Amino acid sequence: MVTKVLNWINYRLPIVNTFERHLSKHPVPKKVNFWYLFGALASIVLILQIVTGIWLMMPYSNTEEGAFASIEYIMRDVDYGWIIRYMHTTGASMFFAIVYLHMFRGLLYGSYKKPKELVWIFGATIYLVMMAEGFLGYVLPYGQMSYWGAQVIISLFGAIPYIGESLEVWVRGDYYISGITISRFFALHVVALPLILIALVCLHLVALHEVGAGNPKGVDIEEFVDEDGVPLDSVPFFPYKVLSAMPAIGVFGLVFCIIMFFFPEGGGYFLELANFEEANPLVTPEHIAPVWYYAPYYTMLRAVPDPFGGLIVMAAAVAIIFIVPWLDRSNVASIRYKGILSKIAIVMFVVSFITLGYLGTVTVTETGKIMSIICTVMYFAFFLLMPIYTSIEKTYEVPKRL
């Protein structure tokens, strides 16, 4: 009877076929390293953020008078409210950390090379939506840093010639950060952007499963198949890769819980101390700094004296990620088989990005200004010079099999 019901459903809604195509019979490379775990971890944290976000949304008040008070109510009076909030705030930082590592893996092993261009573009779009989602959520507690951080970021729209002032008011919905701003940011944060994010993640996975997952060697496993057309150097995603990822997921869960229970503020990087004070439009904090995952772009913004020029540089720093598939002219995908120029370039890129991140969290000094300019140039040089150094360098022969 159960079998008949399942067959009836599957005939009309191909659940079994979908499960087999994307999980139980989906071939993935049999040899990968720990860099390939971050995609699965990102999916887990995304689910965690959605679930905790729903619970936080229930007692939250999206008004100017009630926003900060409702956060305090959640922390003090709602049963387990404090752990749900810390789970959400810790999850936000962990989500960005995982996605940064996931993107770095893509740069290391050429996860953007033909035919994976759409996989990369969907991933870059996910990152862009995450940045918007994180900013909107950052404003909702209506603490001191939320208020003034939003004021700084939204005021950037005012630097756009001709339409800037009107656009700034339109984004805020008022002439200052008010209840109207909180309400519209709340709607976008809990409804619009999560739906877009989920849709993009689905497209990202479908595109990935269509062209096949990569591997550290950059070998095309589709070249050698058995009589059934299954790649010889592959294993089914489920249960093999799922079970092999379980220890890493357990370690990640342990680290996550340690941070959540013992260091939820993350030394002021996850939750700024100024945000434990209610927003006061009459008192400006001594140092306005973004959350750590926006810090590199904030440093680029500050590196340019002209506000509009800084806005262009900051936007270009994100936009240039989208065209990486067409900048890399190398005939190999993996950094293992690229030349010394690519290896030097990616080391300089990592150093510049981390330095930019640090500079964005500290007060501005003359030395910091010089360093921010140098690191901004290094950041863009990695991308803009990529067509040159990937074309002229000597590469190594890629093995045929894993």
State where each predicted segment sits.
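Membrane-embedded and interfacial regions of multi-pass energy-transducing membrane proteins
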Residues: 1-94, 98-402
